[in-house]
Amino acid sequence: MGHFYFVRHGQTVWNVENKICGATDSPLTEHGRQQAAETGKNIVESGIKADEILYSPLSRAADTAKIISEMSGIPCREEPRLIEQNFGKWESTPRDGKGFKTAKESFACRYEGGESMLQLAQRIYNLLDEIKQESDHKTYILVAHNGISRMIQSYFTDMTNEEFAAFGVKNCSITK
């Protein structure tokens, strides 16, 4: 099997405001753009060789991926299945709001106006299965979102519900 690296998008306006982004687009801040450039530089300096960067269609991930691609010379393309989970009516609300915390407790239930954790798992697991079948020798950098990072980690690692809920990556960090 090939290798995967995961990069979460750079800082966004809603990250700063502690709001739930989900499938709603929130642009990168200037700091987020700087983070993306630094990540591209780190990829080059650390000797990471990848065949392709796949990125979420949301601008925060697309812009991050394109900046990394410019810095590293690695070609990139949009992958629609990497879009963040749709949190429905909870999008743009405070991340630490009581209602959202309660709604998150049921993995099987769909967020009102959004998608369930199971729907997200199916989408991401199918993508990873497809990529694995395409080539055993390619290396990919996936640029997406915190919720997607959690789902990718659960694909490769046996995680308890508590470990899954607690897992997260910082903006523009590189995870293998």
List the predicted regions and their residue ranges.
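Short, glycine/charged-enriched secondary-structure capping and boundary segments
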Residues: K19-G22, I67-E70, E91-P94, Y155-M159
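Active-site-adjacent alpha-helix immediately C-terminal to a catalytic or transition-state-stabilizing loop
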Residues: A62, Y125-K176
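Alpha-helical elements of Rossmann-like donor-binding domains used by nucleotide-donor carbohydrate transfer enzymes
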Residues: E38, N42, D63, I67, ...
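Phosphate-handling substructures
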Residues: E70-Y125
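Generic enzyme active-site microenvironment
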Residues: V7, E79, V143
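Active-site-proximal alpha-helix that buttresses catalytic centers in soluble enzyme cores
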Residues: G2, V7, Q11-I74, E115
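Short beta-strand scaffold positions
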Residues: Y55-S56, Q122, V143-A144
